[in-house]
Regions:
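Bacterial N-terminal signal peptides
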Residues: 7-17
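Active-site SXXK
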Residues: 42, 64, 81-107, 134, ...
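A short, well-structured edge-of-sheet supersecondary motif
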Residues: 46-76, 307-310
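Active-site helix/loop module of the DD-peptidase/beta-lactamase fold
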Residues: 82, 101-139, 159, 190-227
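A small/polar active-site loop signature that marks catalytic segments
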Residues: 139-213
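Active-site-proximal alpha-helical segments within enzyme catalytic domains
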Residues: 179-183, 223-244, 298-315, 327
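Active-site Gly/Thr loop motif
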Residues: 208, 256-310
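Short, gly/Ser/Thr-rich active-site loops of penicillin-recognizing serine hydrolases
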Residues: 320-373
Length: 373
């Protein structure tokens, strides 16, 4: 191949790569053209800076268009962010895809997949535990199993006492999500990260996702995934669209419906977003919304009634306060029809979003990305 021909081929590859990157990037639009108030978004940012220590990023989607996006320096658009337990919503999506492919059923007993790791005499309640109970965090445990390097994680989970009848007692349980990941790996021969790549990450244009693994080489599932803010937003938009992306059904709509509906009761306080119920690794919210969330304020909030998605990364200890600012300031920003153009307010919003930074005195709560040192 001549040098000129080689350069030409490289140019074509470059062009195709750029075109593909543009193709999977969400479209941008002015807030008012999508019925969203620029002023209200700006007031959300200003209030968040006053009341929340500290946001890292925010992206607001309306009718499939990004209408506002901002990063608190040193965070940036291309920098992946650790999702903590927001990872769970991605892991449960892998379970849904494996179910759709006939590789398992949510009513399969958990012990079916790990006979070699089962206790010598499993209890009747452990025998009753199903994949469905892992998804809804209703495993029957009184508290979370603890993992260590001294025993394989699956064996540790199965050795943990099950005092309650599975399916009747909600107990937040990250190891239950690890078990979902282990089951997907068992039935597909791939880690959840590998399994989701052609089915979810590649179609959505989620580039180079990273996921922490257990000592046994299983993606940890319930935490440890790192992606960019726009990737979170695209994931939420996929769910808002009932699993359809670019006219292709990536995730069955029936799974989306089950995963985001109330499957387990989590409390009775109408003012608390953690008391609105739990689906398949998604929380129900006030205002008929649902979300995936993770420690220190990671959110993928889906608002079907507003046809909107809000993606937020953060490093705060008061996640309810963070959601309160969303409901108080962002929710009223959405209007039923397009608003008159408002160049002045749009300019003020852009200026505010361009001038964000993490406070110098902020104490960092986040952990390192998978694979980092």
């Amino acid at each position: 191949m001549s040098r000129l021909h080689f350069v030409a081929v490289l140019s074509v590859i470059n062009f195709i790569s750029v075109a593909l990157a543009d193709e999977v990037r969400l479209p941008r639009s002015s807030p008012e053209s999508q019925g969203v108030s620029s002023k209200a978004i700006r007031e959300f940012v200003e209030t968040a800076n006053q009341k929340i220590d500290t946001l890292h990023s925010v992206m607001v989607i309306r009718h499939g268009h990004v209408v506002a996006e901002g990063w608190w320096k040193p965070e940036s658009a291309e920098k992946p962010h650790i999702l903590h337990s927001l990872s769970k919503s991605f892991c449960s999506t892998a379970v849904g895809l494996a179910v759709a492919e006939g590789k398992l059923s949510i009513d399969d007993p958990v012990l079916k997949f790990f006979p070699e790791d089962a206790p010598e005499k499993p209890s009747d309640k452990l025998k009753q535990m199903r994949v469905r109970d892992l998804l809804t965090m209703s495993t029957g445990h009184e508290n979370e199993p603890k993992f260590s390097d001294e025993m394989p994680w699956v064996k540790s989970f199965l050795a943990h006492p099950v005092p309650h009848k599975p399916g009747t007692h909600f107990q937040y349980n990250s190891p239950a999500t690890y078990m979902q990941s282990a089951i997907v790996q068992k039935v597909t021969g791939q880690t959840v990260l590998e399994y989701l790549k052609p089915r979810l990450f590649d179609p959505l244009g989620i580039q180079s996702p990273a996921w922490a693994s257990s000592p046994q080489g299983v993606s940890v599932g319930g935490w440890g995934l790192a992606v960019r803010t726009e990737d979170i937003a695209k994931f939420g938009q996929l769910y808002l669209q009932k699993g359809k992306w670019n006219d292709k059904q990536l995730v069955p709509a029936s799974w989306i419906e089950q995963a985001t509906s109330r499957q387990a009761s989590t409390g009775s306080d109408p003012a608390r977003d953690w008391d609105q119920g739990y689906g398949f690794q998604f929380w129900r919210c006030r205002h008929e919304a649902y979300r995936g969330d993770g420690a220190f304020g990671q959110f993928c909030i889906v608002l079907p009634e507003q046809d909107a998605v809000i993606a937020i990364t953060a490093d705060t200890k008061d996640m309810q306060a963070e959601l309160n600012v969303v409901w108080d300031k962002l929710l009223p920003a959405f209007h039923a029809a397009a608003l008159p153009a408002n160049a002045d307010e749009e300019a003020k919003l852009k200026a505010a979003l361009a001038d964000l930074s993490v406070p110098a005195n902020h104490t960092n709560n986040t952990i390192k990305l998978p694979g980092s040192k």
